[in-house]
A protein has these predicted regions:
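Active-site region of PLP-dependent enzymes
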Residues: 160-166, 173-285, 315-318
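PLP-dependent aminotransferase-like
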Residues: 70-148, 152-157, 164
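Conserved PLP-binding active-site segment of the aspartate aminotransferase-like
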Residues: 283-291, 318-324, 334-346
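Conserved PLP cofactor-binding pocket of PLP-dependent enzymes
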Residues: 213-223, 264, 295-327, 331-337
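Phosphate-binding glycine-rich loop
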Residues: 31-77, 83, 91-95, 101-103, ...
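Generic structural signal for small/hydrophobic residues in well-ordered secondary structure
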Residues: 20, 45, 63, 78, ...
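N-terminal "arm"/small-domain region of PLP-dependent enzymes with the aminotransferase-like
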Residues: 1-30
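Basic phosphate/pyrophosphate-binding loop/patch that engages nucleotide-derived ligands
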Residues: 120, 143-152, 189, 194-215, ...
C-alpha cells in the first residue's frame, strides 16, 4: 500500500534522539532563567543570523508579542499583509495596536511596498512584513519608503530560518525579527521561537525581553526576585532547545535540498501561477494557484498527496472584519494551494507530485 506523501515532515535522526535522552536523564527540563541548552541555542542562532542578539521563546507567536511590546503601539497603526497566519495580526491587537492590512505582490506573496506607501501615515508605528514561504521581502524598498516617518520594521520571519536578503541572513537586517520553530518548520522543534535584535542598546533590550518572557521576573538572586512590569510564561524549554541545536547544524543543508525541489517544481509544473525560484529563499512552503481549489485538492488527496491552504486572508475572519480590506489578497487566498516540499521527499514522490498536478490542471 502506497503511503501518503506528507505536506510537512521533520528531518530527524539518532542525533536528536540522543540529545533528548540526555536532557531527559539530566532532570533539567526547563528554566525560566534560560540557561543550559536554551542559552547555547541563543548564542548559536545569534551567530548564524549574524544579529546583535537573540532571545529564545516558546513560539513564533510569543516572539511577535514580545517584539511588539518593546514599542508603544497602543492606538497606533501597524501595517502588515493579510496573507499570513493569524498570529501576525493577533500580536498587534494584543499590544493595543491597530492592524492596517496591505496588499501583497502576487508573484512573491510578500508585502507590496507600493501598497505600504499608499497607507503610510503619521499614525503608523510599525511595518510588519512577512517573508512568506521563506521568500525574502523587499526590505530595502520598505526602508526607503519609511524615511521621514517615526516607523520601525519588525520582521515576521516565521517561515524564514535560513533565508537571505542582499547576501545577509534574515535576522540581521531590522530592529527585530521573529522566528518560529515547530515540527513543520525548516528548523524543527516541538515548539519554539526566537527574536533577533539589531540595536546599539541590544544588551538592555535583551534584559527586558528576558524578564517579559518569564512573567516579568527580574533582579533574581537565589529565591528572591522582583517584578517591575508584567510578562508572560514564554520561555523555551530544554528539550526544544536541544533539538534546535542539532537542527541548526543541518539547516543550510536541508534548505539547499528544499531549493533543489523548488527548482524542479518551477521548471516542470505546468502552471502560470506558481512560486518563483529564488536562490535566497528557504522554501518553507511552495505554493501554486488553481481556480477550483476544492476539486483540485480532492483529486490530489485521492492520489495520496497532502496539500494545504496557506492561508485564509486574515481580514476575512469575523474578528478582523472591522478593519480595512485587501481584496486582491482575498482572491489569491481562495486559490492558493501549498504542496509538499521537504528534504524527506524521494525522487519518485517529487515526480508523482508534478505528474498529478499537470494531469489535473
Amino acid at each position: 500500500m502506497n503511503k501518503k506523501i506528507k505536506l510537512f515532515d521533520p528531518v530527524i535522526d539518532h542525533l536528536e534522539e540522543e540529545k533528548i535522552l540526555e536532557v531527559l536523564r539530566s532532570g533539567n527540563w526547563a528554566s525560566g532563567a534560560g540557561k543550559g541548552n536554551v542559552k547555547k541555542f541563543e548564542e548559536n542562532f545569534q551567530k548564524y543570523t549574524n544579529s546583535d542578539d537573540c532571545i529564545a521563546v516558546n513560539s513564533g507567536t510569543a516572539a511577535l508579542n514580545l517584539a511588539l511590546s518593546l514599542l508603544n503601539i497602543k492606538n497606533k497603526h501597524v501595517i502588515l499583509p493579510s496573507m499570513s497566519f493569524v498570529s501576525t495580526a493577533n500580536a498587534v491587537v494584543m499590544n493595543g495596536g491597530i492592524p492596517v492590512f496591505v496588499e501583497i505582490e502576487p508573484e512573491t506573496m510578500c508585502i507590496d511596498p507600493e501598497s505600504v506607501k499608499k497607507l503610510l501615515t503619521k499614525k503608523t508605528s510599525v511595518i510588519l512584513p512577512v517573508h512568506f514561504g521563506g521568500m525574502p521581502c523587499k526590505l530595502d524598498k520598505l526602508n526607503q519608503i519609511i524615511k521621514g516617518f517615526k516607523c520601525t520594521i519588525i520582521e515576521d520571519a516565521a517561515h524564514a530560518a535560513g533565508t537571505s536578503y542582499k547576501k545577509k541572513k534574515i535576522g540581521s537586517h531590522s530592529f527585530a525579527s521573529c522566528f518560529s520553530f515547530h515540527p513543520v518548520k525548516n528548523l524543527a522543534m516541538p515548539t519554539g521561537g526566537a527574536i533577533t535584535i539589531n540595536n546599539k542598546q541590544h544588551t538592555k533590550i535583551r534584559k527586558e525581553l528576558e524578564s517579559k518572557r518569564w512573567c516579568g521576573i527580574t533582579d533574581r538572586k537565589l529565591s528572591e526576585y522582583n517584578v517591575k512590569d508584567i510578562g508572560n510564561n514564554y520561555y523555551m524549554n530544554e528539550f526544544s532547545a536541544a533539538i534546535g541545536l542539532i537542527q541548526l547544524k543541518k539547516l543550510d543543508r536541508m534548505n539547499k535540498q528544499r531549493r533543489e525541489i523548488a527548482k524542479i517544481y518551477c521548471k516542470e509544473i505546468d502552471l502560470e501561477n506558481k512560486m518563483q525560484f529564488d536562490q535566497n529563499c528557504s522554501y518553507h512552503l511552495f505554493w501554486i494557484r488553481v481556480k477550483n481549489r476544492n476539486k483540485f485538492r480532492k483529486i490530489l488527496d485521492k492520489k495520496k498527496i497532502e496539500t494545504g491552504t496557506h492561508y485564509k486572508a486574515i481580514h476575512t475572519f469575523d474578528f478582523y472584519q472591522k478593519f480595512n480590506k485587501a481584496p486582491m489578497t482575498k482572491k489569491i487566498s481562495e486559490e492558493i494551494v501549498t504542496i509538499p516540499i521537504h528534504p524527506n521527499l524521494k525522487s519518485h514522490e517529487i515526480d508523482k507530485i508534478v505528474s498529478v498536478i499537470n494531469s489535473t490542471n
